[in-house]
Amino acid sequence: MPGDKVKIALLLAAALAGPVMAGELGVLKPIIKDNDALMRERPDGKGKAFVLEQVRQGKLYEALQQEARSGFTRTMLALDDLAMQVAGDPKGQTSWLMLALEDGGFARCGFWLQDGGKQRWLNECMVDLVVDQDSIADGSFEEIYAHEIGHVFLRRLLPNLPQGYSRTPHHSFSVTDQQTALDEGFATHFQAIARRFTHNQRLLAQDAGAEYKPYTPLWLSNLDRAYRIEGVRQNWFVHQQIAPPGAEDAIVRRELSTMFDRAQLKNPAQMLASEGFDATVFYRYAAVGEGGAELVRRYEPLFRALKALNAQKLATDTSLVPALAQALSGLSRADGDRFVQVLMDTSYGALASPQLAARAEALALTGRMGDGDAFVPALKAVRKEMAEQAAAAQARPAMLAEHIGPALWLLHPTLKALGGGQNDAPLAINLNTAEREHLMALPGIDAARADRLLASRQQSGSFASIDDFLQRAALSAGDAQAIRGMEGAMRAAGPYPRD
């Protein structure tokens, strides 16, 4: 709407005229009853929501307000204010933070606010996070809050984002589905942005490797946090993972692998189902330049594009990041061209051209062997082809989705996602992102047949349908029927809701 554009232009002009403007950080805490957080039925009848009261004093409250005034959180609050403006909120809402008692780290929408003896429903979003003085002092609050409020931005701008079908617990190095990858990747990139622009000396020391602890970095969640930063900076997630040796479940070892083969690329479907890859794209788009008000300004076209994407009919097979590139190009050709260039650079051109992907892999093989005679001329040739393909993609961003293929989901009748260790959901397999270990879990597929299917997918393109997969697999009638049964089971189960 023209009026909305004028309001946002005035907001940005005011921000750029001085220090970054930020909204209020409202602090909430749960009402405790019988040693547990009080919950009450939502007005729409869809489950329960927290009953909360506002915090307005105390040492922790003051430390949070100081962070909101002078830390990087100030910039995130300004971005939340921008997200509200772009989403069309005429009055502006408070950026709410709920002080979780345990197991925090969520973006939630809707809660009961108790004021005096009365409770009223607020259909507003909040970050649910465990916070203490130490987490504020060492910068971990600043970083994790940036991640969680990134989810809030998407709830405001892209509320129609569909749920995905993957049941795999998400990590920066996991391959799930495009919906989860966009949601988590967008939030994750703000952690790297927080590291880029923080002034917290302890977080800077940790980032530089000057503040550290032995042993605890080896824990899964700490590995994940580290890869959300370094993996994004080094563009690791575009590469194929290597399953480490071990006696543990083969699929689990593959999905939790933190080892990447820098001479092998993921296929386009795997890239866009990787939150680490999406995080890298968003980070590279936003990180170049000054922080503060300039950073807020850089996000405005992207926020507009997310809102435009929300107006489209989004489905399971919508290639979300390429669709976002199209939306951004439609609003601003210059910003769209820059986003497409980031996509091309980050994917080594694989999203637009399988030939470019193959040339990048060949170049990597000669490069890591130090073969200058082969590397230098190949580099010159591949750069020329990349420039041509990038120009073509900028002129027609839809081509970035042409090599992804459909999402062909199967629900395994007995195996659990990640072996059932972190959740009890059945294993879901997308045939166009599946690796050797996943295929070998299917009826009639041994190691040799799995390798042939992967080679066929790489050489002849993504599987166009279940029928196409079964034809290439050449399975017995009984095994083919079992796989069709797994397809039907997934249709019956439907998408997988995540917190």
Describe the predicted segments one by one.
Residues R449, L454-I466:
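Residue-level signature of tetratricopeptide-repeat
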Residues E143-N160, E184-T188, A192:
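Active-site recognition of the HExxH zinc-binding catalytic motif
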Residues H412, K416-G420, L470-D499:
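Alpha-helical interaction/regulatory segments in DNA maintenance proteins
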